[in-house]
């Protein structure tokens, strides 16, 4: 009876493993993608592929590092995400974080985003009590954005490099000479472009026909005029956690 049970359990295990293998093989990776991936990451192991919105995404390990790479179906590389330690962050990023509003929060995870033709971005996942935020920094320590991490999704697909129209590129070059373009995305018919200009992160929004709509930047609470700060402090929201 025991031998029979062991045999049955072994068959079940084989069935589960076969099911997992079938799931993995269900993603058809184009030859061009496989060739590009092999050339970029010759030491990759434990490779698993997934189709995410038309992008071929590989999760793998290389030199002991957990990584993820994004390609289109033609084999063009877009982005690589590397799981790194806090100590591996550029000094400018560590300095900015430790001098910022989240310095007392626990750093749960750190990712490095290498992107085709655009700025390298570092993402710190920080948490305190029930709150979690993703903090995006440029290589020279500029805080680009702070996003509540409500669903625990570690996918940084929204940071894939996007091509800008000539009208938008020309406007940014004229209005913000020397600006570095960090990210761009389409949202509700508008194009939102994140740039670094004069050492600050700006978000520039364009509407129909790529016409400029507005530009905004975040400021620290200490930079807010006293009258505004007092009004906020006396409001129902208080000053426990305000993003301006």
Predicted features and spans:
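C-terminal motif of bacterial Sec signal peptides marking the signal peptidase cleavage site
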Residues: 16-19
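Acidic/polar, low-complexity intrinsically disordered N-terminal segments immediately downstream
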Residues: 23-83, 87, 94-95, 131, ...
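Amphipathic N-proximal alpha-helical interface segments
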Residues: 54-81, 121-149, 189-217
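Positively charged n-region of N-terminal signal peptides that target proteins for export
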Residues: 1-4
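Conserved small/polar residues in nucleotide/adenosyl-binding loops
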Residues: 242-244
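A charged, solvent-exposed segment within the mature domains of Sec-exported extracytoplasmic proteins
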Residues: 112-166, 170-174, 178-180
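Sec-dependent N-terminal signal peptides
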Residues: 6-10
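A low-complexity, Ser/Thr/Gly/Pro-enriched, surface-exposed linker/loop concept
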Residues: 30-31, 72-105, 144, 150-158, ...
């Amino acid at each position: 009876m025991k031998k029979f049970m062991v045999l049955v359990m072994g068959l079940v295990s084989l069935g589960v493993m076969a099911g997992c293998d079938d799931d993995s093989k269900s993603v058809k990776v184009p030859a061009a993608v496989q060739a590009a991936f092999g050339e970029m990451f010759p030491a990759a192991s434990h490779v698993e592929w997934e189709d995410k919105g038309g992008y071929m995404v590989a999760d793998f390990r290389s030199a002991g590092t957990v990584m993820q790479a994004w390609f289109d179906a033609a084999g063009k590389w877009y982005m690589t995400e590397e799981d790194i330690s806090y100590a591996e962050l550029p000094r400018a990023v560590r300095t900015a974080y430790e001098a910022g509003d989240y310095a007392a929060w626990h750093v749960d995870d750190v990712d490095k985003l290498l992107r085709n033709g655009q700025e390298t971005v570092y993402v710190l996942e920080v948490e305190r009590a029930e709150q979690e935020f993703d903090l995006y920094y440029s290589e020279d320590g500029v805080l680009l954005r702070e996003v509540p991490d409500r669903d625990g999704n570690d996918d940084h697909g929204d940071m894939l490099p996007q091509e800008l129209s000539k009208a938008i590129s020309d406007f940014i070059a004229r209005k913000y000479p020397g600006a570095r373009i960090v990210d761009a995305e389409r949202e509700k018919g508008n194009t939102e472009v994140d740039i670094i200009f004069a050492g600050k992160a700006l978000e520039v929004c364009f509407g129909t026909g790529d016409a400029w709509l507005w530009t905004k930047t975040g400021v620290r609470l200490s930079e807010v005029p006293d009258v505004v700060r007092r009004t906020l402090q006396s409001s129902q929201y208080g000053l426990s956690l305000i993003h301006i």
